Protein backbone atom coordinates (compact mmCIF):
# COMPACT_ATOMS: atom_id res chain seq x y z
CA UNK A 1 0.00 0.00 0.00
CA UNK A 2 1.02 3.62 -0.42
CA UNK A 3 3.12 4.71 2.54
CA UNK A 4 1.64 7.86 4.17
CA UNK A 5 5.19 8.95 5.01
CA UNK A 6 5.79 9.49 1.29
CA UNK A 7 2.85 11.90 0.99
CA UNK A 8 3.28 15.63 1.59
CA UNK A 9 0.09 17.60 2.33
CA UNK A 10 -0.30 21.37 1.94
CA UNK A 11 -3.47 22.97 3.31
CA UNK A 12 -4.59 26.40 2.13
CA UNK A 13 -7.78 28.35 2.79
CA UNK A 14 -9.00 27.56 -0.73
CA UNK A 15 -7.41 24.20 -1.51
CA UNK A 16 -5.63 21.11 -0.19
CA UNK A 17 -2.72 19.64 -2.15
CA UNK A 18 -1.17 16.19 -1.79
CA UNK A 19 2.12 15.14 -3.39
CA UNK A 20 3.37 11.55 -3.50
CA UNK A 21 6.96 10.76 -4.37
CA UNK A 22 8.76 7.38 -4.20
CA UNK A 23 6.50 6.04 -6.94
CA UNK A 24 8.33 2.70 -6.97
CA UNK A 25 7.69 2.03 -3.29
CA UNK A 26 4.18 0.61 -3.41
CA UNK A 27 2.65 -2.59 -4.75
CA UNK A 28 0.96 -1.82 -8.05
CA UNK A 29 -1.26 -4.91 -7.78
CA UNK A 30 -2.42 -4.01 -4.25
CA UNK A 31 -3.28 -0.44 -5.24
CA UNK A 32 -4.99 -1.60 -8.45
CA UNK A 33 -7.26 -3.77 -6.31
CA UNK A 34 -8.47 -0.61 -4.55
CA UNK A 35 -9.63 1.04 -7.78
CA UNK A 36 -13.12 0.98 -9.28
CA UNK A 37 -13.40 -1.09 -12.49
CA UNK A 38 -13.51 1.92 -14.81
CA UNK A 39 -10.28 3.35 -13.37
CA UNK A 40 -8.65 -0.07 -13.51
CA UNK A 41 -9.46 -0.18 -17.22
CA UNK A 42 -7.82 3.23 -17.67
CA UNK A 43 -4.68 2.01 -15.94
CA UNK A 44 -4.55 -1.27 -17.86
CA UNK A 45 -4.66 0.64 -21.16
CA UNK A 46 -1.33 2.28 -20.24
CA UNK A 47 1.54 0.24 -21.68
CA UNK A 48 4.48 1.18 -19.44
CA UNK A 49 4.66 0.51 -15.70
CA UNK A 50 5.68 4.04 -14.71
CA UNK A 51 2.57 5.43 -16.38
CA UNK A 52 0.43 2.85 -14.60
CA UNK A 53 1.95 3.86 -11.26
CA UNK A 54 1.31 7.54 -11.95
CA UNK A 55 -2.31 6.92 -12.90
CA UNK A 56 -2.98 4.69 -9.88
CA UNK A 57 -1.31 7.13 -7.49
CA UNK A 58 -3.22 10.13 -8.86
CA UNK A 59 -6.60 8.48 -8.30
CA UNK A 60 -5.63 7.18 -4.86
CA UNK A 61 -4.56 10.68 -3.79
CA UNK A 62 -7.90 12.02 -5.01
CA UNK A 63 -9.74 9.43 -2.92
CA UNK A 64 -7.69 10.36 0.16
CA UNK A 65 -8.36 14.07 -0.33
CA UNK A 66 -12.08 13.58 -0.86
CA UNK A 67 -12.43 11.39 2.24
CA UNK A 68 -10.26 13.45 4.59
CA UNK A 69 -11.19 16.95 3.50
CA UNK A 70 -14.59 16.69 1.78
CA UNK A 71 -16.29 13.92 3.75
CA UNK A 72 -16.74 11.74 0.65
CA UNK A 73 -15.79 8.09 1.01
CA UNK A 74 -15.78 5.31 -1.53
CA UNK A 75 -15.33 5.50 -5.27
CA UNK A 76 -16.56 8.51 -7.24
CA UNK A 77 -17.53 8.86 -10.88
CA UNK A 78 -15.32 11.04 -13.05
CA UNK A 79 -16.19 12.73 -16.33
CA UNK A 80 -14.37 15.04 -18.73
CA UNK A 81 -15.17 18.42 -20.23
CA UNK A 82 -14.69 18.96 -23.97
CA UNK A 83 -11.18 20.26 -23.36
CA UNK A 84 -10.27 17.08 -21.48
CA UNK A 85 -10.39 18.50 -17.96
CA UNK A 86 -11.75 15.96 -15.44
CA UNK A 87 -14.58 16.77 -13.04
CA UNK A 88 -16.87 15.03 -10.55
CA UNK A 89 -20.39 14.99 -12.04
CA UNK A 90 -22.07 14.10 -8.73
CA UNK A 91 -20.14 16.72 -6.74
CA UNK A 92 -20.22 19.91 -8.85
CA UNK A 93 -19.02 22.14 -5.99
CA UNK A 94 -15.77 20.21 -5.57
CA UNK A 95 -13.01 21.11 -8.01
CA UNK A 96 -9.89 19.01 -8.48
CA UNK A 97 -6.91 18.49 -10.73
CA UNK A 98 -4.05 16.01 -11.02
CA UNK A 99 -0.55 16.07 -12.47
CA UNK A 100 2.51 13.85 -12.58
CA UNK A 101 6.16 14.00 -13.50
CA UNK A 102 8.95 11.44 -13.58
CA UNK A 103 9.39 11.29 -9.80
CA UNK A 104 6.09 12.38 -8.23
CA UNK A 105 2.32 12.79 -8.51
CA UNK A 106 0.22 15.75 -7.33
CA UNK A 107 -3.52 16.06 -6.69
CA UNK A 108 -5.45 19.11 -5.49
CA UNK A 109 -9.05 19.67 -4.37
CA UNK A 110 -10.45 23.18 -4.09
CA UNK A 111 -13.50 25.32 -3.46
CA UNK A 112 -13.14 26.94 -6.88
CA UNK A 113 -11.77 26.13 -10.31
CA UNK A 114 -8.21 24.87 -9.95
CA UNK A 115 -5.29 23.52 -11.95
CA UNK A 116 -2.01 21.95 -10.85
CA UNK A 117 1.24 21.12 -12.61
CA UNK A 118 4.28 19.29 -11.30
CA UNK A 119 7.58 19.18 -13.20
CA UNK A 120 10.90 17.54 -12.43
CA UNK A 121 13.91 19.83 -12.25
CA UNK A 122 15.94 19.25 -15.39
CA UNK A 123 18.57 20.94 -17.53
CA UNK A 124 17.63 24.21 -19.22
CA UNK A 125 16.50 23.68 -22.82
CA UNK A 126 16.93 26.89 -24.81
CA UNK A 127 14.87 25.80 -27.83
CA UNK A 128 11.95 24.74 -25.61
CA UNK A 129 12.18 28.02 -23.69
CA UNK A 130 11.99 30.04 -26.93
CA UNK A 131 8.98 27.98 -27.99
CA UNK A 132 6.86 28.48 -24.85
CA UNK A 133 8.00 31.81 -23.38
CA UNK A 134 7.18 35.32 -24.48
CA UNK A 135 10.14 37.54 -25.39
CA UNK A 136 10.00 39.26 -21.99
CA UNK A 137 9.77 35.94 -20.14
CA UNK A 138 12.70 34.52 -22.11
CA UNK A 139 14.88 37.51 -21.23
CA UNK A 140 13.89 37.19 -17.56
CA UNK A 141 14.74 33.48 -17.52
CA UNK A 142 18.09 33.78 -19.27
CA UNK A 143 19.10 36.68 -16.99
CA UNK A 144 18.25 34.64 -13.89
CA UNK A 145 21.04 33.15 -11.72
CA UNK A 146 19.32 29.78 -12.27
CA UNK A 147 17.66 29.72 -15.72
CA UNK A 148 16.52 26.10 -15.35
CA UNK A 149 14.64 26.79 -12.11
CA UNK A 150 13.13 30.07 -13.33
CA UNK A 151 12.01 28.36 -16.53
CA UNK A 152 10.35 25.51 -14.63
CA UNK A 153 8.62 28.02 -12.34
CA UNK A 154 7.09 29.80 -15.34
CA UNK A 155 6.37 26.53 -17.12
CA UNK A 156 4.38 25.16 -14.17
CA UNK A 157 2.49 28.45 -13.90
CA UNK A 158 1.51 28.26 -17.56
CA UNK A 159 0.58 24.59 -17.44
CA UNK A 160 -1.46 24.96 -14.24
CA UNK A 161 -3.32 27.91 -15.80
CA UNK A 162 -4.12 25.91 -18.94
CA UNK A 163 -5.29 23.00 -16.79
CA UNK A 164 -7.40 25.32 -14.64
CA UNK A 165 -9.17 26.80 -17.67
CA UNK A 166 -9.30 23.50 -19.54
CA UNK A 167 -8.38 25.22 -22.80
CA UNK A 168 -5.14 23.33 -23.40
CA UNK A 169 -3.71 23.64 -26.91
CA UNK A 170 -6.40 26.13 -27.92
CA UNK A 171 -4.49 28.82 -26.00
CA UNK A 172 -1.16 30.33 -27.08
CA UNK A 173 1.17 29.17 -24.31
CA UNK A 174 3.45 32.16 -24.88
CA UNK A 175 0.74 34.63 -23.87
CA UNK A 176 -1.18 32.60 -21.29
CA UNK A 177 0.11 34.73 -18.37
CA UNK A 178 -0.64 38.12 -20.00
CA UNK A 179 -3.11 40.27 -18.01
CA UNK A 180 -3.59 37.30 -15.72
CA UNK A 181 -5.44 37.70 -12.42
CA UNK A 182 -5.29 34.06 -11.36
CA UNK A 183 -3.80 33.15 -7.99
CA UNK A 184 -0.64 31.03 -8.04
CA UNK A 185 1.13 29.09 -5.30
CA UNK A 186 4.43 27.40 -6.14
CA UNK A 187 6.08 24.75 -3.98
CA UNK A 188 9.76 24.08 -4.61
CA UNK A 189 11.39 20.77 -3.76
CA UNK A 190 14.91 19.50 -4.44
CA UNK A 191 13.48 17.34 -7.23
CA UNK A 192 10.45 19.20 -8.58
CA UNK A 193 8.34 22.36 -8.78
CA UNK A 194 4.57 22.27 -8.18
CA UNK A 195 2.28 25.18 -9.01
CA UNK A 196 -1.41 25.46 -8.09
CA UNK A 197 -3.51 27.93 -10.09
CA UNK A 198 -6.82 29.17 -8.68
CA UNK A 199 -9.52 31.02 -10.57
CA UNK A 200 -9.81 34.58 -9.26
CA UNK A 201 -12.65 35.79 -11.49
Language-model segments: which ranges?
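Core catalytic alpha/beta fold that binds nucleotide/phospho-ligands
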Residues: 1-201
